[in-house]
Amino acid sequence: MVCLKLPGGSCMAALTVTLTVLSSPLALAGDTQPRFLEQAKCECHFLNGTERVWNLIRYIYNQEEYARYNSDLGEYQAVTELGRPDAEYWNSQKDLLERRRAEVDTYCRYNYGVVESFTVQRRVQPKVTVYPSKTQPLQHHNLLVCSVNGFYPGSIEVRWFRNGQEEKAGVVSTGLIQNGDWTFQTLVMLETVPRSGEVYTCQVEHPSMMSPLTVQWSARSESAQSKMLSGVGGFVLGLLFLGTGLFIYFRNQKGHSGLQPTGLLS
């Protein structure tokens, strides 16, 4: 959680003021007048839930941090000489220090409980696909791509296997990419020379799943692919003939049932 505030002030109030200033006509990109930006960033750090919590408040002037408050130390520290007078003054304000020390509970732990259900506990299972980067004959250098998309949180482990043996050499990754909707994606690629009969497996482990998710890609020769396509084509053609035959049969049956038997006329 990050917010803006000044010593003794409210995070929300300071954030509102900052947004108002930045959205005013004076903050337009075409304005060439010199601007000076004062920031205060509140950071709540958590370890094992709320078992270990510390609060860090950083004071920044024109992108340079000059002072900070660390709840582990319970006092303000000067980062540069510019911040020394401020740190000394704030440390002399006992009521301010007491409020800062209490914020570990009143601000950090409290807000953890508010957002935990849709942040810390949020789980979205990844979607995994495997494909070669280029369509070319076997026994040529290729790049197998394992696309892992739409998962949350960002902690994930992706491994490549060839015929059941893990491949570590030739594995490259794009790293985590944010999708902008609180999910992530990554591409993990394996440089290899596929040979007929080999089976490549991308294995994904993620907190949203109880067990690893595996997706396989099999290397097939051109003749094997041709046979498979021929088989599929023959199967589809057979279905067409079967459908046509059934259609003709049922149409003929309907025609016969519509004929009135002879000898029943009066």
From Swiss-Prot:
What start and end residues bound the annotated signal peptide?
1-29
Share the record's PTM remark. Ubiquitinated by MARCH1 and MARCH8 at Lys-254 leading to sorting into the endosome system and down-regulation of MHC class II. When associated with ubiquitination of the alpha subunit of HLA-DR: HLA-DRA 'Lys-244', the down-regulation of MHC class II may be highly effective.
Extracellular topological intervals:
30-227
The entry's stated outcome for residue 110 to H is: In allele DRB4*01:05
Cross-link Glycyl lysine isopeptide (Lys-Gly) (interchain with G-Cter in ubiquitin) residue location(s): 254
Instruction: Output a single Gene Ontology CC term carried by this record.
Output: Golgi membrane
Top-level taxonomic group: Eukaryota
Q: Which UniProt keywords apply?
A: Adaptive immunity, Cell membrane, Disulfide bond, Endoplasmic reticulum, Endosome, Glycoprotein, Golgi apparatus, Immunity, Isopeptide bond, Lysosome, Membrane, MHC II, Signal, Transmembrane, Transmembrane helix, Ubl conjugation
Q: Which SUPFAM superfamilies match?
A: Immunoglobulin (SSF48726), MHC antigen-recognition domain (SSF54452)
Q: Which GO terms describe its biological process?
A: adaptive immune response; antigen processing and presentation of exogenous peptide antigen via MHC class II; peptide antigen assembly with MHC class II protein complex; positive regulation of immune response; positive regulation of T cell activation
Glycosylation site list: 48
Q: Where is this region: Beta-2?
A: 125-227
Subunit: Heterodimer of an alpha and a beta subunit; also referred as MHC class II molecule. In the endoplasmic reticulum (ER) it forms a heterononamer; 3 MHC class II molecules bind to a CD74 homotrimer (also known as invariant chain or HLA class II histocompatibility antigen gamma chain). In the endosomal/lysosomal system; CD74 undergoes sequential degradation by various proteases; leaving a small fragment termed CLIP on each MHC class II molecule. MHC class II molecule interacts with HLA_DM, and HLA_DO in B-cells, in order to release CLIP and facilitate the binding of antigenic peptides.
Protein's recorded name: HLA class II histocompatibility antigen, DR beta 4 chain
Q: Organism, per UniProt?
A: Homo sapiens (Human)
